Swiss-Prot record:
Gene3D superfamilies: 3.30.60.80, 3.40.1360.10, 6.10.250.240, RecR Domain 1. CDD domains: TOPRIM_recR. This is Recombination protein RecR. The lineage of its organism: Bacteria, Pseudomonadati, Thermodesulfobacteriota, Desulfuromonadia, Desulfuromonadales. It comes from Pelobacter propionicus (strain DSM 2379 / NBRC 103807 / OttBd1). InterPro entries: DNA_Rcmb_RecR, Rcmb_RecR, Rcmb_RecR_Znf, TOPRIM_dom, TOPRIM_RecR. Belongs to the RecR family.
Length: 197
């Protein structure tokens, strides 16, 4: 019986760690890469480049190659901070061209079942940013999932005593969906129709 070479097995194992990639898909991808050595080389170089150049912005925690990121270093409205779960959600909001403030990436949501509490998120850093002054509004743009809603309510309760406006994206984004997958027009409508909490 023919067995997979150990290097191929390792590649398949690493590919399976990607979201939505099972054994068969990983094997198909591995064989495709083997058939096109130039793609394999380009992919490995790209992975090494991402590892060495991409980091989190020290202000908003979005992924970036420059620190601070282009949004934090630019001339955006610093009086408004949009709080998102991750950098993918930030990019989805940016595609709408409807928001012109700054961002704060939590790097997750409160999820007791997964053992993630508020202290595992970038909430302390958000409070420190607000504490430095100049922030008039925080737009909570967590996803409309159970965890996203719990995180939004936690943030609203935490921020209310600070005397700043707290708003939530309007529910034009379907419940249970991730902002990352919503079209730009819907995101724009949701930003414009956001509600105060």
């Amino acid at each position: 019986m023919l067995t997979k070479p150990s290097a191929l097995s390792r590649l398949v194992g690493e590919l399976k760690k990607l979201p939505g990639v099972g054994e068969r898909t990983a094997l198909r991808l591995a064989f495709h890469l083997l058939k096109t050595p130039q793609n394999l080389t380009a992919l490995s170089e790209s992975l090494l480049e991402v590892k060495s150049r991409v980091r989190s912005c020290s202000i908003c925690f979005a992924i970036t190659e420059d620190d601070p990121c282009a949004i934090c270093a630019g001339d955006r409205d610093t009086g408004t901070i949009c709080v998102v779960e991750n950098s993918q959600d930030l990019m989805a909001l940016e595609r709408s061209n409807a928001y012109h403030g700054t961002y704060h990436v939590l790097e997750g949501v409160i999820s007791p079942l997964a053992g993630i509490g508020p202290s595992e998120l970038r909430i302390a850093e958000l409070l420190a940013r607000i504490g430095r002054g100049g922030v008039d509004e925080v737009v909570i743009a967590t996803n409309f999932t159970v965890e996203g809603e719990a995180t939004a309510l936690y943030l609203a309760k935490l921020l209310k005593p600070l005397g700043i406006r707290i708003s939530r994206l309007a529910h034009g984004i379907p419940l249970g969906s991730d902002i990352e997958y919503v079209d730009a027009a819907t995101v724009q409508w949701a930003l414009q129709g956001r509600n105060q909490l």
